[in-house]
Amino acid sequence: MFEDNHPDFQNEVKEIWTSDIETKVKDFSTRVSVTNTPFIIYISGIDTYGSITTVSRSDVNMIVTVNPNTKKILLTSIPRDYYVTLANMQKKDKLTHSGIAGPENTVKTMAKFLGTDINYYARVNFTSLVTMVDALGGITVNVDRDFSAGGYTYKLGLQQMNGKEALAYSRERHSFADGDNVRVKHQQDVLMAML
């Protein structure tokens, strides 16, 4: 993706050292019987490439409420710039900053803000979104308007997207007067296309 915006990136940047870090992921889910009990999944999208364990802001904050009895799913997105009481500091700050203290802090912050249990969570970053969409063979999204972003052009109507196109589609906000609201809708469009 860097290469798309900086064609000389490979020639101008030299890798001098790399390190692999393994991190055990703590499971703090509140498990329920998903076949007959409604449950909530929190999806945190962090604004980085590479390892999913990278410390970063939580820019996508999506609540997926699943009711297996009615076979319905409700998507609710909370804007990253909402001021909420952060679980780790007990003071108000932007929701996006909760991610800096890790996914458990963000889940606890969201649960307190919404006044409900979060049964499961998933953390996604730029790399994992591209990988998932490509693993599906791409996705078909019903694009709601013509625009260009990240070197890609999106046309009104059904459009097939690979991982990089889906990422650029779900990140763009500067092309729209109501940018953050449109970006949230596009993020939901991408998730629904993946299901």
Regions from the PLM with identified roles:
Residues 1-195:
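Non-catalytic, solvent-exposed segments at the cell envelope interface
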